[in-house]
Amino acid sequence: MTSSSPTGGGPGRPSALAPEIADRLKRSADGLLPAIAQQYDTGEVLMLGWMDDEALHRTLTTGRCTYWSRSRGEYWVKGDTSGHFQWVKSVALDCDADTVLVKVDQVGAACHTGTRTCFDTDVLLADQ
């Protein structure tokens, strides 16, 4: 599902995110936070997406990952198009409150290329 919020959507727009969470966030200049999706039971890093306050609110309240597409300028819910859902198990902020870690139960591929993870094809350094 892709959508804009009723107020036009996007970074810097009003959101229903709880003020006690929103006030702690350190966003980029464009109002976004990097959101790392990690498989909850194996620790496998799946992908990195971007969230604004509204995307984080939707993720926390629906139990499904919602991201902000910087290229399309709209929200997207992982799995609505591909069927490769991310069911949220936990959400945490890092120590600086500038990155979100979303532990998920990934159904199918996390990467738009069809692979399980976005980090498996261009390895720059690996143990010998």
From Swiss-Prot:
Cofactor: Mg(2+); Zn(2+)
Location(s) in or outside the cell: Cytoplasm
UniProt keyword Coiled coil, yes or no: no
Pathway assignment: Amino-acid biosynthesis; L-histidine biosynthesis; L-histidine from 5-phospho-alpha-D-ribose 1-diphosphate: step 3/9
Gene Ontology biological-process entries: L-histidine biosynthetic process
Catalytic activity: 1-(5-phospho-beta-D-ribosyl)-5'-AMP + H2O = 1-(5-phospho-beta-D-ribosyl)-5-[(5-phospho-beta-D-ribosylamino)methylideneamino]imidazole-4-carboxamide
PANTHER family reported for this sequence: HISTIDINE BIOSYNTHESIS BIFUNCTIONAL PROTEIN, PHOSPHORIBOSYL-AMP CYCLOHYDROLASE
Record-stated family: Belongs to the PRA-CH family.
Record-given protein name: Phosphoribosyl-AMP cyclohydrolase
Source species: Streptomyces coelicolor (strain ATCC BAA-471 / A3(2) / M145)
Taxonomic lineage from the root: Bacteria, Bacillati, Actinomycetota, Actinomycetes, Kitasatosporales
